[in-house]
Amino acid sequence: MSSQLGHESSVSSPLSYKTDSNAFTREYAESLDAQDPLRDFRKEFIIPSKVDLKRKTLAIDDSSKDESDPRCIYLCGNSLGVQPRNARKYIDYYLRTWAIKGVTGHFLPHEDQLLPPFVDVDDAGAKLMAPIVGALESEVAVMGTLTANLHFLMASFYRPTQERYKIILEGKAFPSDHYAIESQIRHHNLRPEDAMVLIEPEDRLKPILRTEQILRVIDEHASSTALVLLSGIQFYTGQYFDIEKITAHAQSKGILVGWDCAHAAGNVDLRLHDWNVDFAAWCNYKYLNSGPGGMAALFVHERHGRVDMDKVGSDEEPFRPRLSGWWGGDKKTRFLMNNNFLPQTGAAGFQLSNPSVLDMNAVVASLELFNRTSMAEIRQKSLNATGYLEHLLLNYPADFSTGKRPFSIITPSNPAERGAQLSLLLEPGLLDSVLETLEEHGVVVDERKPDVIRVAPAPLYNTYTEYPTYRT
């Protein structure tokens, strides 16, 4: 395997849950929490209480502060992360700046500011985001929304010719990705049935895509493919693709490679720059906790973000073609309004409009927490916690009459091939009753009809003690 997965396969877990008969007890889980180096991060987040989940109003009352009201077991960070406690402070500071400075807040700094003036707030976001995805600061822009960013990137990187016009993607890609790719193909007056290559699982009951299968499809269509666009982590199964190996293989065939990292950013230890990825995009409201529909981000490798000043004014393109907007323009000339577009170097040159400072504050509130640790530490906790939860589930009592458990786990069993997610395929007809039972016990998970629930133990705020309770 490539270094991406091979490195993680060699990680030795300090946990002994597979051989310890006490692993199913609360006391054992509490001992794991006691030795967790990330345990103090939980207090940095607001976990909904069981009472909160059942409230019919949003009005704040004293009961919401009742310490006897237990927190819910929130295992849905792969769908929407919980609120960082400091989000309110960041947003309050933004509102205060807007209130007392108005338009001058774009340029005037404050001694007690959390973020720079409005005009530079996107730079602060990029600086904090870069280490989370393994990128240079210049390769990241915090901007827009995920599907819009995919369109912007494909406008630059999908440039079909008569010979190369196909896009390779998962057969069960997230619907918005599928729609975006299909519409880009139609935009170029091509037929999706000719230009979309869908990689389907070989086993319907175990819907994962083997790396060898993906590479084989790339080989079969190499001479006619313009772009490979896959998910870093597959939203349905939780499978972590071998980004480095797939990228290198496709590029060796002259194919550009992009990744939707919606379920990977803030989840696994990405190395987008080192893996030579051409481009990537992701949302920030899942593992990165920016709030519903929060501002997204994109990555453009430095080789694609260069601006050749020697070619400015010549017949040669000084920069990669793209959809352009004023916020992507050179800062030195941005406010001259001369209508001569010259982009900033790097991913910032792919920006279009000025960013929502309100949304940027919500993103940065969480990124600041991630920057207090490292993705390597977060990933190690994820490997431990997801493995522990898997162990508990695999030892769930079987039905006495059939000898079978009422579910199977369709997420890869190899820890290096998954993130902080386990997808459980339930026996037909069980979904509604299982969800009802979980809701009664204050457990929040994600459903994918007809029969799958996705469980995501988020390393920064979930505890080991929660998992025996969830299993029960």
UniProtKB/Swiss-Prot annotation:
It catalyses: L-kynurenine + H2O = anthranilate + L-alanine + H(+); 3-hydroxy-L-kynurenine + H2O = 3-hydroxyanthranilate + L-alanine + H(+). Its cofactor is pyridoxal 5'-phosphate. Pyridoxal 5'-phosphate binds at L146, T147, F174, P175, S176, D177, S231, D260, H263, Y285, W326, N354. Its EC number is 3.7.1.3. Pathway: Amino-acid degradation; L-kynurenine degradation; L-alanine and anthranilate from L-kynurenine: step 1/1; Cofactor biosynthesis; NAD(+) biosynthesis; quinolinate from L-kynurenine: step 2/3. The keyword Hydrolase applies. Catalyzes the cleavage of L-kynurenine (L-Kyn) and L-3-hydroxykynurenine (L-3OHKyn) into anthranilic acid (AA) and 3-hydroxyanthranilic acid (3-OHAA), respectively. NCBIfam families: kynureninase. Homodimer. This is Kynureninase 1.
